[in-house]
Amino acid sequence: MNELFSIAGKVAVITGAGGVLGGNIAQHFVQQGAKVVAIDIRQEQLDNRVAELKQYGQDVIGIIGDVLDIASLEKVAEEIVAQWGQIDILLNIAGGNMPGATLASAQTF
């Protein structure tokens, strides 16, 4: 991969990582050498995803977080900075791959 676009060593935070879409994105990031912070509201799905991701690389942590709760997100951010010092990439996938998560065309304007 072109070094200009390399994500190796970058800290990537992925909300909704316990789900299918977020989990697959997280897997790709780990395979590309990123340090991945998997965030989900569901403990069991998060634990399963982190175990799966660690098959591809050890720079993976899972943190329970609720994207609808500011205090929860502040705590998550503090944990990430304490662990890896920074956040380079943020992908907000939580809730986006659920029925009803899209807007009708009349709601977009």
Give the positions of each predicted feature.
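Conserved mid-core segment of classical short-chain dehydrogenase/reductases
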Residues: 74, 97-109
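Structural signature of the Rossmann-like NAD(P)-dependent dehydrogenase/reductase core
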Residues: 14-16, 92-95
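Canonical Rossmann dinucleotide-binding motif of NAD(H)/NADP(H)-dependent dehydrogenases/reductases
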Residues: 3-37
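Structural signal for short hydrophobic segments within the conserved structured cores
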Residues: 37, 60-63
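The beta1-alpha1 cofactor-binding region of Rossmann-like NAD(H)/NADP(H)-dependent oxidoreductases
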Residues: 43-44, 64-76
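A glycine-rich helix->loop->beta "capping" turn
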Residues: 7, 56-59, 79-92, 98
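Short, conserved SAM-binding/catalytic segment
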Residues: 49-57
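Conserved glycine-rich Rossmann-like NAD(P)H-binding loop of the short-chain dehydrogenase/reductase
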Residues: 32-49
